[in-house]
């Protein structure tokens, strides 16, 4: 997994300092990973903003409650299987993603059957990206 081939596109700003601290901790460990924050609004405006931000060479990975739930090891294996494909992990706002955006997904991913605030979902995702990299590199960070 190459962090420079991944972006996180998220609606809204992180307002809680402890969440921002966690995100920054993992960002430093994943050099090259980009996080794009888009203004929160209504779902249609958010969807348009996300569509405009997605690049043609990226596969959108939509984070959603109805997405595929994976173990950390399975997540790392999936990332490895995608090779050098550019990925854009998309985290919607409070009202989630529109049906139109969900239809654009190359992969629908759920972090859990539970619902999380988008700020916390961002922290969980970046930690799982770091964990996936650690698993693929054989690092002791992941202890199953």
Curated annotation (Swiss-Prot):
Quote a single Gene Ontology cellular component term: cytoplasm
Xref: CDD domains? RlmH-like (cd18081)
Compartments, record wording: Cytoplasm
Where S-adenosyl-L-methionine binds, per the record, is at 92, 111-116
A single GO molecular function, which one? rRNA (pseudouridine-N3-)-methyltransferase activity
Enzyme Commission identifier(s):
2.1.1.177
Q: Which reaction does it catalyse?
A: pseudouridine(1915) in 23S rRNA + S-adenosyl-L-methionine = N(3)-methylpseudouridine(1915) in 23S rRNA + S-adenosyl-L-homocysteine + H(+)
Q: What class of enzyme is it?
A: transferase
Q: Kindly name one Pfam family recorded for this protein.
A: SPOUT_MTase
Database matches in InterPro entries: Alpha/beta_knot_MTases, RlmH-like, tRNA_m1G_MTases_N
Task: Provide the disulphide bond pattern.
Answer: none
Keyword annotations: Cytoplasm, Methyltransferase, rRNA processing, S-adenosyl-L-methionine, Transferase
**Role played:** Specifically methylates the pseudouridine at position 1915 (m3Psi1915) in 23S rRNA.
Family, as annotated:
Belongs to the RNA methyltransferase RlmH family.
Q: What assembly does the database describe for this protein? A: Homodimer.
- The protein's name is Ribosomal RNA large subunit methyltransferase H
| Record organism | Synechococcus sp. (strain CC9311)
Q: What is the lineage of its organism?
A: Bacteria, Bacillati, Cyanobacteriota, Cyanophyceae, Synechococcales
